[in-house]
């Protein structure tokens, strides 16, 4: 089975889309699928190579477009599919819309039919969604937000729906962890995700100087390969509200979460409502930053 993953990363959208699809790609490859990442530009290629730790680990195709122009990539995707027809295309992007999925399906079908001279079904489409902005014209939709199981009626167009935390795309190293009981706080983890536009890592380090040991996962700090092992050794975490929150839950680490983007704010509030984290607020607002510093 051939599967394409259409995702990007840059300073604007950070690395979450590629990070979670890398987890999915690893499992798909283990099951025997051939996976190709289809990226907007060279910046996304650099992010993927950095996140995977091996520049040659994954097959990649770069469309040569600026991020955020999904309409312009439709003919390029169709042309690419003529040479290597995928069985599935998994899309993880905030730039697309409901109309885009309909146009992608019809563009692919028309291109393949013209190329092969007969009716040929277009690749199936899958979509990872955490914004709930539209009901995608997809064969499969994935939403692993804490309250996503209540969205069954929202996603009417998808043939299959994978909804709720049990579908969170955690890496294999987080399977079957055995968290330890933490009687005191001697080691704190600070995590900002793939980007740190507000310099929170250094600011937080200054705030927790009284703690004997601090670990940091943020841009400009040494890359951590064995993340699960690191998390198991931490007694408390202060983390941006990305998929890392699910990893912290898997490791049983009590977590103070903050947000610095709109999608993070929604996710953090959902995780707090579920009792999984304590949400301190959005650091883009003075109130949230003040609460975090206290």
Q: Model features per residue range: what roles?
A:
Residues 1-4:
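Extreme N-terminal starter segment of soluble prokaryotic enzymes
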Residues 6-15, 20-33, 38-51, 57-156, ...:
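Active-site and donor-binding regions of nucleotide-sugar-utilizing enzymes
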Residues 19, 195-207:
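A conserved mid-protein helix/loop that constitutes part of the nucleotide-sugar donor-binding site
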Residues 136-198:
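A nucleotide-sugar donor-handling region in carbohydrate enzymes
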Residues 212-221:
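Catalytic donor nucleotide-activated moiety binding site of glycosyltransferases and closely related
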Residues 224-234, 249-250:
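Short acidic alpha-helix that forms the nucleotide-activated donor recognition element
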Residues 232-243:
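Acidic donor-binding loop of glycosyltransferase active sites
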Residues 245, 249-292:
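Catalytic binding pocket for nucleotide-activated donors in carbohydrate/polymer assembly enzymes
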């Amino acid at each position: 089975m051939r599967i394409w993953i259409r995702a990007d990363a840059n300073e604007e959208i950070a690395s979450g889309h590629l990070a979670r699809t890398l987890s999915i790609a690893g499992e798909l490859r283990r099951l025997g699928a051939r996976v190709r990442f289809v990226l907007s530009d060279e910046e996304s290629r650099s992010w993927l190579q950095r996140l995977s730790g091996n520049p040659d680990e994954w097959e990649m195709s770069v469309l040569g477009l600026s991020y955020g122009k999904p309409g312009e990539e439709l003919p390029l995707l169709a042309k690419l599919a003529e040479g290597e027809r995928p069985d599935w295309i998994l899309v993880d992007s905030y730039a697309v819309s409901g109309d885009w999925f309909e146009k992608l399906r019809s563009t692919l079908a028309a291109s393949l039919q013209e190329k092969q001279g007969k009716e040929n079904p277009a690749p199936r489409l899958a979509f990872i969604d955490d914004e709930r902005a539209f009901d995608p014209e997809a064969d499969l939709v994935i939403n692993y937000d804490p309250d996503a199981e209540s969205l069954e009626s929202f996603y009417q167009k998808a043939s299959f729906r994978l909804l709720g935390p049990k579908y969170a795309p955690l890496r294999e190293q987080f399977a079957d962890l055995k968290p330890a009981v933490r009687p005191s706080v001697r080691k704190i983890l600070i995590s900002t995700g793939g980007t740190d536009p507000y310099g929170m890592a250094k600011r937080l380090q200054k705030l927790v100087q009284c703690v004997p040991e601090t670990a940091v996962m943020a841009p400009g700090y040494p890359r951590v390969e064995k993340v699960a092992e690191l998390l198991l050794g931490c007694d408390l975490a202060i983390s941006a509200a990305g998929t890392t929150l699910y990893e912290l839950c898997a490791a049983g680490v009590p977590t103070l979460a903050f947000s610095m983007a709109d999608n993070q704010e929604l996710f953090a509030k959902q995780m707090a409502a579920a009792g999984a984290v304590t949400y301190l607020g959005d650091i883009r607002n003075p109130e949230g930053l003040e609460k975090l510093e206290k």
